[in-house]
Amino acid sequence: MSSWMASIPSPGPEWAQIHLPFLPFRIQTYALIILTGIVVAAMWTSRRLTKRGAEPGVVLDVLLWAVPLGIIGARLYHVVTHPADFFYPGANVWNPFQPGAIWNIWEGGNAIFGALIGGAVGVGIGCRWTGLRFWTFADALAPALLLAQAIGRLGNYVNQELFGLPTSLPWGLEIASGNKAIPVGLPEGTLFQPLFLYEIVWNVIGVFVILWLERRFRLQWGRVLAVYLIWYGLGRSYLESIRIDPSEFSFLGIPSNVWAAFAAVVLGAIILRVQAQRHTGLEPGPYLPGREWVSPQAEVESGETDPEEILHADDDEERTGTHKPQATSLSGSN
């Protein structure tokens, strides 16, 4: 090709795992990338919540529920939508000490839509526990989540996952010939659409779009989350339609992930409409009534007496010999 880029090479299998001599096991590169995305999202979400008046670090109390349930949801969704990968004659379905079990998330197979469902349940529990408004937390999380998803797609690149139909474009992705997702009959050296890269670009653009719309229209009450759902659903519906995933369950000839992307768009539109009708003003604060957190600085400024000031006042009275008269008790009780 005369183009400046002939193709995008994929990392070799040695990149998929990291071996440290002092550890008895290998660390999955994909897991480290996902962890990086979670940390970035947590830090940014915490900053956005703190600006709204939430307690610093409260995001960790919510993520304590959201992350584990998100991981469980991601795995369950993948198992349900890819039954042929787990349920076949002679398959090891349940034994986690053998390859192929449904519990073995380190072998790959985690779905973002399942993570969103499980994570949403976890956020609901965490917000109820901390007293945060669900919509406030969801709005603070939305752009950070999209950025975390962009980071996570680098893990798909390392694992040679999430690629699309064959292409002759100069940025076609090289995939090892032994990859099980490659359709039978394609010639050696066939290049594929780098869907992981497309989604990274789409998600990063979406972060800026969400932030601009949030500031331009002062979006609250879950409407930032709604924009996230619409944006991500639109992009993912197209990418899934050109993705090669032969084991994915389909309904009416449409892959399950495309249906999930459509559902995300519809849900986002419903949230926008319903919340615009129910809440015309701004949120009164990040906490539910009666669950508010008051910062130490605010307590001092509210007029509460500092114990040190009382001690200093007593010392001044002793030096000057002046004392304030004590109020006489009318009830006679001590």
Swiss-Prot record:
Indicate where this protein resides in the cell.
Cell membrane
Q: What is its EC number?
A: 2.5.1.145
- Topological relation to the membrane, as annotated: Multi-pass membrane protein
| Keywords per UniProt | Cell membrane, Membrane, Transferase, Transmembrane, Transmembrane helix
Q: Which PROSITE patterns match?
A: LGT (PS01311)
Ligand binding (a 1,2-diacyl-sn-glycero-3-phospho-(1'-sn-glycerol)): 153
Single Gene Ontology MF annotation: phosphatidylglycerol-prolipoprotein diacylglyceryl transferase activity
User: Could you tell me where the Acidic residues compositional bias lies?
Assistant: 301-318
Q: Which protein family is named in the record?
A: Belongs to the Lgt family.
Which protein is depicted? Phosphatidylglycerol--prolipoprotein diacylglyceryl transferase
Native source species: Leifsonia xyli subsp. xyli (strain CTCB07)
* Organismal lineage: Bacteria, Bacillati, Actinomycetota, Actinomycetes, Micrococcales
UniProt gene name? lgt
